[in-house]
């Protein structure tokens, strides 16, 4: 939950109350992370062999606009991973170590807390097909993984605060039960528990509160999948009216008190030659608020500003420990006040830290939740923003993730300004622009918005300018009104790169079937039989490798030498003033190697030929005086913790066939023993010019031109 609060704070600092920017808080459970390719175990410090100051993982987000191919820059977002009981951690306030059974709950799985930015028009309307890409970079995992969320997935039809009423009541009951069974807790907690118990008993008597039994546990699945549907707008309106009525009663009561005991205006004699006219400080303000003084009074020689400030403040106040706002009563329910000023407690400046109360000292908070605030802070030894949010109504909405078919959770808090929060401005994310488009399709009898008549499309574009590209006359760069458009784009890129590589290798072998020992190795006589076996199996091995490359999945492709080299090649061709570098960590060693730096994917040569390297290995291939080439690791010699394939250079081990590419998209296929062939895949890469920028923006860092 701290990640949600941090992201919301950052969002408000950057965008303020912008009408075109919003935020949505989500929890991504372990099941969804696993299906997306993120290993939840590696998101926790527990799997590390030794502690490290470096973060376990970092999360980046990018907005990808509907059908345009355009993207925002990658931006870092705060994220937090809870290994166990992720949803429970949002529903249950902090349980102190010395009070481990304060609140009882049923733990759920782990989950990732993160917040995603939503862009909309000035009326709060958003495009449901715009999506947010979430990238998780794990320190101990060189692979990169993206999780895609469309706005339609992220923004439910409504909130479910009503389903949370039972949890709030159960928190109160559990607190009362714990305090009543533990006499050692502070008196403030006992007082709070007694008031909560009285209020809950009154609710039960009037049957106005949710019916919960003592001993029940807070179960996140119960609130997530049962307890009612979306909040009824009429019911929410009634709640708001009730709140307004309560505040009206409080205001009227304060006016009555003020009429009975009007605030005095005092004119006191001159002090140090200056006339002072002071009003009483409003009740509830700290007495330490500075009074207005004569501007020259501080400059006087021998002037004691501390005593003078106290005198000036207290002149207009009622005497301490007496007056119409204070009477004798039990111990104050507020938390203990902070340390006094350095001055003596007996002098007037020591009174500056006192707090004036609007009502008598034994006056109660308005609701059981107010008392829960006081009691929980007393038991926990203090309060935190996250506990304030936990002790108030929370909306949990289960959503189905399109890419993984798993559930994730959209969270809204009463004290939040993000989507669904009760502190959000009016007309905050008012709705999607797509229902009017669908209605137009039904009226026109077409099955796709781009098949609408030109005049209808023009009307929709005039009403919603963000539909200019999806509904324009020119076919959009990326498929419009298709939730799978992003997957189709990267699969298209995968197909183009695979085709270019295989065509280049095939053309090279047809022109020159013989493969010489391009990589220099000394082969002992006792390995002669292995070399003969490899030579005899070479056609079958190459065919099997080609088949493995052709069947590579999108996830494997995004972590392959093939994709990273293709991105570098496209960046050179684009001629863009803003340089781009593939954000994959495996590409970093290639920055200093130039054309000699190759990224190699390793494939097994025994039995079934499969890709064994989850990420490519950076190898420097340099020419020697003999006309052959030598290889060395770009990152230095591997250590004992390296995987088996990482300990061998291309061609050095008979168990692997290696396929490498450099930044010029030149391929090098190396068989055991160093027998290899080179081919230019760049000449065979056919990628549309209008899709160069979209693919680079998605998978590269952008380097500013200045």
Curated annotation (Swiss-Prot):
Pfam families: Herpes_UL17. GO terms for cellular component: host cell nucleus; viral capsid. Keywords: Capsid protein, Host nucleus, Late protein, Viral genome packaging, Viral release from host cell, Virion. One of its GO terms (biological process) is chromosome organization. Residues 321-347 are annotated as: Disordered. InterPro entries: UL17-like. It is found in: Virion; Host nucleus. The keyword Lyase does not apply. The keyword GTP-binding does not apply. Belongs to the herpesviridae CVC1 protein family. Interacts (via C-terminus) with capsid vertex component 2/CVC2. Capsid vertex-specific component that plays a role during viral DNA encapsidation, assuring correct genome cleavage and presumably stabilizing capsids that contain full-length viral genomes. This is Capsid vertex component 1.
């Amino acid at each position: 939950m701290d990640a949600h609060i941090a992201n919301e704070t950052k969002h408000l600092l950057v965008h303020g109350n912008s009408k075109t920017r919003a935020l949505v808080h989500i929890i991504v459970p372990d099941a969804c992370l696993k299906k997306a390719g993120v290993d939840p175990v590696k998101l926790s410090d527990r799997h590390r062999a030794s502690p490290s100051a470096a973060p376990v993982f970092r999360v980046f987000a990018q907005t990808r606009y509907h059908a345009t191919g355009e993207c925002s820059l990658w931006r870092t977002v705060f994220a937090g991973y809870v290994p166990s009981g992720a949803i429970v951690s949002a529903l249950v306030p902090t349980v102190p170590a010395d009070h481990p059974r304060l609140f009882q709950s049923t733990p759920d799985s782990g989950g990732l807390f993160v917040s995603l930015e939503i862009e909309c028009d000035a009326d709060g309307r958003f495009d449901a097909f715009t999506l947010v890409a979430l990238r998780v970079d794990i320190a101990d995992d060189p692979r990169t993984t993206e999780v895609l969320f469309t706005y339609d997935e992220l923004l439910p039809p409504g909130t479910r605060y009503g389903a949370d009423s039972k949890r709030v009541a159960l928190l109160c009951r559990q607190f009362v039960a714990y305090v009543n069974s533990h006499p050692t807790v502070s008196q403030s907690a006992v007082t709070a528990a007694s008031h909560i118990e009285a209020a809950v008993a009154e609710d039960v008597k009037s049957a106005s509160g949710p019916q919960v039994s003592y001993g029940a546990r807070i179960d996140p699945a119960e609130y997530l999948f049962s307890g009612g549907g979306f909040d009824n707008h009429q019911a929410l309106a009634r709640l708001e009216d009730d709140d307004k009525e309560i505040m009206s009663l409080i205001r009227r009561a304060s006016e009555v008190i003020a009429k009975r005991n009007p605030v005095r205006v005092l004119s006191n004699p001159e002090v140090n030659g200056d006339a002072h006219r002071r009003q009483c400080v409003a009740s509830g303000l700290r007495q330490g608020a500075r009074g207005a003084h004569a501007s020259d009074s501080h400059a006087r020689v021998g002037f004691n500003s501390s005593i003078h400030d106290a005198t000036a403040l207290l002149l207009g106040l009622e005497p301490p420990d007496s007056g119409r706002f204070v009477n004798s009563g039990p111990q104050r329910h507020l938390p203990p006040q902070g340390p006094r000023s350095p001055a003596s407690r007996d002098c007037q400046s020591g009174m500056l830290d006192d707090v004036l109360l609007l009502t008598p000292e034994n006056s109660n908070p308005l609701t059981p939740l107010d008392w829960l605030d006081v009691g929980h802070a007393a038991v926990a030894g203090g309060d935190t923003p996250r506990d304030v949010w936990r002790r108030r109504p929370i909306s949990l909405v289960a959503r189905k993730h399109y890419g993984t078919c798993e559930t994730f959770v959209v969270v809204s808090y009463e004290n939040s300004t993000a989507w669904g929060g009760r502190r959000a401005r009016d007309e905050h994310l008012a709705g999607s622009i797509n229902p009017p488009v669908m209605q137009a399709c039904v009226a026109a009898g077409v099955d796709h918005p781009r098949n609408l008549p030109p005049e209808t499309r023009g009307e929709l574009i005039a009403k919603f300018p963000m539909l200019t590209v999806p509904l324009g006359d020119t076919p959009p760069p990326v498929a419009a009104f298709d939730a799978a458009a992003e997957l189709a784009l990267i699969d298209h890129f995968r197909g183009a790169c695979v085709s270019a590589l295989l065509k280049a290798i095939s053309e090279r072998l047809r022109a020159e079937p013989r493969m010489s020992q391009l990589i220099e190795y000394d082969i002992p006589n006792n390995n002669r039989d292995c070399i003969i076996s490899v030579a005899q199996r070479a056609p079958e091995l190459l065919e099997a490798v080609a088949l493995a490359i052709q069947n590579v999945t999108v996830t494997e492709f995004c972590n392959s030498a093939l994709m990273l080299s293709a991105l570098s090649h496209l960046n050179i061709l684009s001629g863009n003033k803003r340089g781009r570098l593939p954000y994959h960590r495996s590409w970093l060693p290639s920055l200093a190697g130039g054309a000699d730096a190759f990224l190699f994917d390793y494939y097994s040569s025994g039995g079934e030929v499969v890709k064994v390297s989850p990420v490519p290995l950076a190898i420097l291939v340099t020419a020697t005086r003999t006309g052959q080439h030598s290889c060395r690791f770009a990152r230095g010699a591997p250590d004992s913790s390296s995987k088996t394939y990482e300990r061998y250079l291309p061609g050095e081990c008979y168990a692997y066939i290696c396929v490498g590419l450099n930044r010029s998209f030149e391929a090098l296929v190396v068989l055991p023993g160093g027998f290899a062939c080179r081919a230019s895949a760049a000449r065979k890469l056919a990628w549309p010019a209008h899709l160069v920028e979209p693919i680079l923006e998605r998978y590269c860092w952008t380097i500013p031109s200045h």
